[in-house]
């Protein structure tokens, strides 16, 4: 039997996941993180993107995170997300529209374009689409 640890994924609205997992993958402020059982204690900001949860017996779940904090303690990992949405709950049409709008905003020739904000919106839309794609494959 594979080693596991307890994971809690919590957003401001509700608890998204609580249970035993074999590992997770998430994007931290310094890059991609793979958290396995026995990982050293860690506290880091997480970037907008997804968390890949590998539950017992290799079953996978994907959750979109708009950002937040990851805390790793012995035997327990907590993700405090600003917003968390399960892959199956994401609306693909809305994500595609958000991506299109962000791309249009970036291409806009207006002088008042905030490229940092437009780029952040584009990254969020792309992350949502990736979560949708991976969730479909996992089903």
From Swiss-Prot:
Q: How does it sit in the membrane?
A: Peripheral membrane protein
Which GO MF terms does the UniProt record name? ATP binding; proton-transporting ATP synthase activity, rotational mechanism
The record lists the organism as Cronobacter sakazakii (strain ATCC BAA-894)
Q: What does this protein do, in the record's words?
A: Produces ATP from ADP in the presence of a proton gradient across the membrane.
Q: Which controlled-vocabulary keywords does the entry list? A: ATP synthesis, Cell inner membrane, Cell membrane, CF(1), Hydrogen ion transport, Ion transport, Membrane, Transport
Report the locations given in the UniProt record: Cell inner membrane
InterPro entries noted in UniProt: ATP_F1_dsu/esu_C_sf, ATP_synth_F1_dsu/esu, ATP_synth_F1_dsu/esu_N, ATP_synth_F1_esu_C, ATPsynth_dsu/esu_N
Supply the source organism's classification: Bacteria, Pseudomonadati, Pseudomonadota, Gammaproteobacteria, Enterobacterales
Tell me which family the UniProt entry assigns to this protein: Belongs to the ATPase epsilon chain family.
Membrane-spanning parts: none
Question: Know the name of this protein?
Answer: ATP synthase epsilon chain
């Amino acid at each position: 039997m594979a080693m596991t640890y307890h994971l809690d994924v919590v957003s401001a609205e509700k608890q998204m996941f609580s249970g035993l997992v074999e590992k997770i993958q998430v994007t931290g402020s310094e890059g991609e993180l793979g958290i396995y059982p026995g990982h050293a204690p860690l506290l880091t900001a997480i970037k907008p993107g997804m968390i890949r949860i590998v539950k017992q017996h290799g079953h996978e779940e994907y959750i979109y995170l708009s950002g937040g904090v990851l805390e790793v303690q012995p035997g327990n990992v907590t993700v405090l997300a600003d917003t968390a949405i399960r892959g199956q709950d994401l609306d693909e049409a809305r994500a595609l529209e958000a991506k299109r709008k962000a791309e249009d905003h970036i291409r806009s020739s207006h002088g008042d374009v905030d490229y940092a904000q437009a780029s952040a919106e584009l990254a969020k839309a792309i992350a949502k689409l990736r979560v949708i794609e991976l969730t479909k494959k996992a089903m």
